[in-house]
Amino acid sequence: MPAAIDKDENIQKEGKRIELVKDSPKQFAASGAAAVSAQPNSDKLADVSPLHAERTVAQAQEASVSSFNEEEVIHDLQHYLPSQAPLKDFIHHNTLHAFQNYPFHEGTRRAKKIFGYFPSLQLREYRDLYEAGRIRKDILERVISEQKGAQHLEDWMQRLLEKEYDDSVSPRIGKLRANWKRHYPIDLDLMVHPLLFRILCSYLDQGISIWGFPIGHKGFLAALKEMEEKSFASFFKTKRAKKLLVSGNCKMADLLKLLVGDETLYAQYLFDQQFAHPGWSGMVASVEAQPASLLNPKNITVHDLVVFELLLEIDALDSYFGESWEPIAHILEERPEPLFADVPETEVDTVFSLWHDAFEWTYYDQVLTGIALQDKTWERKIENRSFQTYFCIDDRLTSFRRYLEQLDPDCETFTTAGFFNVELYYQPENGKFYTKCCPAPVFPKFLVKEIGNKQKIKKEVHFSKLTHSLFQGWFISQTIGFVSALRLALNVFKPGSMPAGASSYTHVDKNATLTIENKDPNDKENGLQIGFTIDEMVQRVQGVLTSTGLNGVDKTFAPIVYMIGHGASSVNNPHYTAYDCGACGGRPGSVNARTFCYMANHPKVREALKERGIIIPPTTQFLPGLHDTTRDEVAFFDEEILSEENAGKHRRNTLVINEALDLHAKERSRRLVSIDTKMSPKEIHEEIRRRSVSLFEPRPELNHATNAVSIIGRRSITENLFLDRRASTSTYDYRTDPEGKFLTMSMGPIALVMGGIDLEYFFSRTDNHKMGAGTKLPHNVMGLIGVANGADGDLRTGLPSQMIEIHDPVRLLVIIEHYPDVALKVIKSQTANYSFYENYWVHCLALHPDTGELWLYKDGSFSKIYKPLLNDLETVSDLSALMERAKKAESIETLDAVQENLPVYFIEKKERVKK
């Protein structure tokens, strides 16, 4: 996930860019036909008055002054291109981050009209949802009345429900460059892209190819130039393009003069060109911005990519027409509309925004009704805590917490960002590279190294490089190859683990030690401090414990406090890092959990914490664990540190945890068509495990599909609500943090991590063709950096359809339990993330701790009290029965998928008896 956009910087840059593109049409219009030919036509000037001719010549001369700013255009391209990192660092982010400096509906409208994205459901789908009751009439009427006035309610209801609209998209992007095909009988993309993509893939390859790219240590363009000079074969079919590259006379402006001919069209042409393959262009931009994202470093820039593609286009045209073809400006019949000209709101845009707001608030209203009707004074009282667990804020873990509390009423659960406030780089033993284990925008100063890894790396003979050689490859295919085919067939009926699988448990060896403590600040490696000093440990442990209200005074410690990170296992899944912990940079949370527990168990850290008002009893021990969310299994680390008494308690706690995992697997199974939810929890859990290692299962788990809400507050707010695993929760106790100091820490990952997750699912769901990756079935892994359809396709960005089919595209609703003025101060202090709230890319409410009022963020402040329209929610007493009778989606049509999501329920409060 990229760092959040700096609003002021982007507005300034946007302003410069808009000024450029708005000036260009003026120059074009002023010079008339001269702008097309780039030279004033004196014969035509003779037909006009002397005054007009003088003015026209002056304007033509003004237009001849260069209006093309190469650096500015490249910068703009980098801003608007997809910012998806290579597969090993795939982390969710706002797909339309480039428009985040606009209010949500305006930004999505611009993205739709400029780039052809479809950022909402179809009009037919909204109307179907309304007919099915999934968009409530009272909510729709409230939305219309608030935005258009109550006096216009009937008129707008008629428009939304009955009027026919043309909701097709005719984007501005590509219209200039489309004139090649319109004027000449050629498909320039078809002639250029296959070769371009293969060269890019070969150059950026991270380990698939047996032969590395020749001269790969040089920059992209420099390497191509040297290869062209020293090779018998050529990248080009004609002499001119080759000569331009080899001679070094390939300045971008000169090449554009040959291809375009009019400087005022250069920028638009480059946008058309690069957005014909946004996947590869975006990958190049991402690698240029973060070279360390490639383990096999490559020096490539968007500038070099553009120059080489321009050369290939010149070569393609020369091969077809010789050198007699005209620049595109000379063959224009009609000048295209400037790409970034203003995008006025039309009636159909308003209709879409009203429908979508009503769709969102129909769900939000249920959640807020549940919160508003809660007993504000109720909080579960626990006299003798059996154990306490910390989980990540991840929405997939909310039901796991619920089952733990149901099975053991004396346990207590907390949530915090899954990196547990310890930002670090991690280096496995014998590893060449550092792995960042913290949110993507954070750049740690600390390095934790693994020592004593005794894991044996599984090997597979079919992965041998010999399989690619002529004779050995033939021999292996004719012998071991048959065994491989049999194993593949067997996997259909009896899935099992294999070396090709990705398992979160291999992230760190269970028996290895970590260099967590730093006793000498000068102990550094590559500028990174190895381990943490005592003071640094104290700060991080205090932050987590204080923000969650666990300080040993107001709330006492249990004998064992589990810090459980999360990861995932999968087979044949290129997007595997998207299933791991986003707060850990797309890595499992095991290293962070072990690091935090070491800190919290350190005697000197506890002494310092005691001076700060946090009293941890000597009998309390912190124990790290890792939850595999695909298999629903938990593994523990460092169990040998437990005292004899706590070891016995840990064994009893493990029984509770395993039973909770069985129940959790049953709840998950209601969305998995291949599993009968009426089976016993243990039988279902076994089926879940088999799915996780099946080569033929495109949906081993549904990851964050259906996520919609993020709640920052005490557990009592949500403990008696059934939210269908759609809410991420961050434990925060305002009573221990009246000024909001630690709320800032809790809010840090909300917009960036959870908001990014929500928005990527949102846009991959509404337009899976352009903003998503399409179906997984034709995907090929390209160079270990991305996936493409077939061998010569563009890289696919966003999420595959199998991850988003059941997702409701709604913005994240953030609910903060604190006084509105404190909540406002905190979100405004986070300048890097504030645009999420300011421009409504996420919704935000403050839950007043004293009155229970829900204050909605609007126009820069929490100035409006939201009053839910529902008076009550249905109460459910048996969740297992609810899961068994819940409807499974019959198709991936929006109406079917949405109806699979259960409404919000109250969970009947029962007298809990510990088993």
UniProtKB/Swiss-Prot annotation:
Kindly name one Pfam family recorded for this protein: DabA
Query: What is the recorded membrane topology of this protein?
Result: Peripheral membrane protein
InterPro entries the UniProt entry points to: DabA
Q: Which cofactor does it need?
A: Zn(2+)
Q: Please provide one cellular component term from the Gene Ontology annotations of this protein.
A: plasma membrane
Taking the record's annotation, the residue ranges forming a coiled coil are none
Key words of the record? Cell inner membrane, Cell membrane, Membrane, Metal-binding, Transport, Zinc
GO MF term set: zinc ion binding
Tell me its family. Answer: Belongs to the inorganic carbon transporter (TC 9.A.2) DabA family.
Function, in words: Part of an energy-coupled inorganic carbon pump.
Query: Can you state the subunit structure given in the record?
Result: Forms a complex with DabB.
The record's listing under HAMAP family reads:
DabA
Q: What is this protein called?
A: Probable inorganic carbon transporter subunit DabA
